[in-house]
Amino acid sequence: MTGHAPLVGVIGGSGLYKLEGIEPVESLNIDTPWGRPSSPITLFKLPSGPVVAFLARHGVSHQFTPSEVPSRANIAALKKIGCQVIIAFSAVGSLREEIKPRDIVVPSQIIDRTKSVRPCTFFEGLGVVGHAMFGEPFDTELTGLVTKSIKEAVTGFEMNDRIGVHAEKVAICMEGPAFSTRAESNMYRMFGGDIINMSVLPEAKLAREAELSYALIAQITDYDAWRESEEPVTVAEVMATIAANVSVSNRLTLTILDEVHNAVAKGQLKTCKGTMEYSVMTKKEMISEESKKTLSFILPYFS
């Protein structure tokens, strides 16, 4: 890797397979103890000069289902190249009338409705037990900065590009790949969910274990299946909304990345560095050298 390490990593969701309008400077293929990421990591140079890292969650050809995404490799690779912060994008369904297609949500909480088929911890199979603090699943300082940045950017848009911006919402993460039944969609509403997707977990948990600050930018594409007055969501509907929103998304992304990078570089964001050091229950002298080597890929104090 040439030049300065990227401080900010971007994980692109459905429809976001690269960063438009900025210069790619390098493509990296990173091997991790948990395999290779879902795509090469591309380093992009922002117009203001800094470099950011990007990978496509589902692969450049969208070949990984939500259950197949190699999230451990994705997070580990971004940590290895120097990222301290992850901004993740995801196409999501709305569970609330007031959260409309094309709106953006920066959630603050998650309800896990996955089915334990996705590897969800870096400690599995290593003879090591770690318990990450996860009461606030998204970094609160980072989500605050991202929300502020988006709201300020949106006020400068032309009227036909105006979108709603929502914060402090609850994301449901379901297994997929099929969409919800109407009954499930209504159940998630009763749970208190505001949006629904298939990707935020285990991504957010793994980011916490790797001591990376993590925020999700959720782009609303549909109303899921709870509205009896219309047909349930389809892939065609999702992709049509993404296509209609692509220019807005690109402008927002550049603004957000600049502001987040500057905040990290100036020490204005408290990062998650060191948060896992006292979250491991297993005595260090009882951990095998092989396991220490594996974990040191993301947590240097195992070296």
UniProtKB/Swiss-Prot annotation:
PROSITE patterns registered for this protein in UniProt: PNP_MTAP_2
Pathway: Amino-acid biosynthesis; L-methionine biosynthesis via salvage pathway; S-methyl-5-thio-alpha-D-ribose 1-phosphate from S-methyl-5'-thioadenosine (phosphorylase route): step 1/1
GO biological process: L-methionine salvage from methylthioadenosine; purine ribonucleoside salvage
Protein residues bound to substrate: M198, D222, Y223, D224
Enzyme class: transferase
Main location: cytoplasm
EC number in record: 2.4.2.28
Cytoplasm keyword on record: yes
Any single Gene Ontology cellular-component annotation: cytosol
One matching Pfam family: PNP_UDP_1
Catalytic activity: S-methyl-5'-thioadenosine + phosphate = 5-(methylsulfanyl)-alpha-D-ribose 1-phosphate + adenine
Localization of this protein: Cytoplasm; Nucleus
Keyword Signal belongs to the record: no
GO MF term set: S-methyl-5-thioadenosine phosphorylase activity
UniProt binding sites for phosphate: S14, R57, H58, S90, A91, S199
Coiled coil: none
Site (Important for substrate specificity): S180, V235
Keywords: Cytoplasm, Glycosyltransferase, Nucleus, Purine salvage, Transferase
Bridged cysteine pairs (disulfide): none
UniProt similarity note: Belongs to the PNP/MTAP phosphorylase family. MTAP subfamily.
Subunit structure: Homotrimer.
Role played: Catalyzes the reversible phosphorylation of S-methyl-5'-thioadenosine (MTA) to adenine and 5-methylthioribose-1-phosphate. Involved in the breakdown of MTA, a major by-product of polyamine biosynthesis. Responsible for the first step in the methionine salvage pathway after MTA has been generated from S-adenosylmethionine. Has broad substrate specificity with 6-aminopurine nucleosides as preferred substrates.
The protein, known as: S-methyl-5'-thioadenosine phosphorylase 1
